[in-house]
């Protein structure tokens, strides 16, 4: 093969490799790398201008018990301001979830929120369950760090309160710094 053709082929391969880098998932710091945890190439999946996804990983039963999903997102501008206010006062979120705009009937969900104490950044824990109590609650936690106009947020959703809060604190320590 002539040298010029090899060079052109190498440039094409390099260009294609660089173009697909967005499809290579970034692992979430603070959760184990590799199986049973799976990282997703989130940046190419979400095209909204509201948040920049940084990383997403999940671990599903039966390999992982309890099941957990962890994400790291960056917000800017007004979205960062609103989210930062909710991180500091999670009862705002609970009120909005209980009486969403445009609904005539109240939501039939038990919602409880509480600030995360002893956390290095503002954040909260939340639980959501059907009001009839037929299903177990889902748990969530969020912690965020402000940096200028942007806000980096760690979100964790899972099946047990303790696992969610422990994971949120551990990931926030690694992703947001201590």
Model-derived features: where do they sit?
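Bacterial Sec signal peptide processing site at the extreme N-terminus
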Residues: 18-36
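Sec-dependent bacterial lipoprotein signal peptides
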Residues: 1-21
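Stable alpha-helical elements in mature extracytoplasmic
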Residues: 41, 89-93, 164-171
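A short, solvent-exposed beta-edge/loop patch
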Residues: 124-158
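Post-signal peptide N-terminal segment of mature Sec-exported envelope proteins
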Residues: 30-52
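Short, solvent-exposed coil/turn segments at beta-strand boundaries
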Residues: 40-44, 63-64, 118-121, 144-151
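Conserved polar/disulfide-associated segments of primarily extracytoplasmic proteins
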Residues: 53-138
